[in-house]
């Protein structure tokens, strides 16, 4: 049986070994005009995490990138420090060997904003790794994480004009509920 790139891709914990390929992915997002997916050009944009701000320039420093990795990993703990509007989340990175391909995040609960706009799961595949099944494989893997954590049903949203993401969500069993504020909203029952 022929293996596809999505068969080789793995969901892994964020790790400093992805430093260079992570930065290259940020550059790809910027070059594609997708700064909202570049992730950390100025994160968090609303400056709501006192003492925590990552930029493309600051992440050139391996120590700062390790700080980012550590910060992301701490956000899995519901007791970790975060602004009131944020919820605990688990972020996994899509990788092939030491090559960063993208990320997928699972928010452990929904607040009002996430219920309308963000959903439980969000993902981004770097432009150079698209159209290879990575988003579908990552979503399938994260749905298993939802199952283990007892998150059911799962809300996933995408922009109304994001046809590839719509197909990915529907392919994972998403049932369309409605459109709110420019977002298609889908539920997956586990």
Model-derived regions: residue spans:
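GNAT-family acyltransferases
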Residues: 1-120, 145, 179-190
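Secondary-structure transition/hinge residues
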Residues: 30-34, 129, 150
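A short, internal acetyl-CoA/4′-phosphopantetheine-binding micro-motif in the GNAT/acyltransferase core
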Residues: 95, 108, 120-131, 159
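Conserved acetyl-CoA-binding loop-helix of GNAT-fold acetyltransferases
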Residues: 122-125, 131-148, 166-171
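Conserved active-site alpha-helix within GNAT-family acetyltransferase domains
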Residues: 160-178
């Amino acid at each position: 049986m022929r293996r596809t790139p999505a068969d080789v891709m793995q969901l892994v914990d964020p790790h400093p070994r992805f430093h260079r390929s992570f930065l290259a992915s940020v550059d790809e997002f910027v070059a594609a005009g997708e700064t909202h997916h570049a992730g950390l050009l100025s994160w968090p944009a609303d400056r709501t995490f006192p003492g925590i701000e990552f930029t493309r320039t600051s992440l050139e420093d391996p120590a700062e990138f390790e700080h980012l990795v550590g910060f992301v990993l701490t956000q899995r703990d519901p007791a970790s420090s975060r602004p009131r509007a944020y919820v605990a989340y688990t972020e996994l990175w899509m990788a092939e060997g030491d090559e960063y391909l993208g990320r997928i995040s699972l928010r452990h609960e929904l607040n009002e904003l996430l219920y309308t706009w963000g959903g439980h799961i969000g993902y981004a595949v770097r432009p150079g790794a698209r159209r290879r099944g990575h988003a579908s494989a990552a979503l399938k893997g994260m749905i298993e994480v939802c199952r283990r954590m007892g998150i059911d049903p799962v809300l996933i949203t995408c922009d109304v004009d994001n046809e590839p993401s719509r197909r990915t969500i529907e392919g994972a069993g998403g049932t369309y509920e409605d459109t709110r504020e420019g977002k298609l909203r889908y539920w997956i029952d586990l």
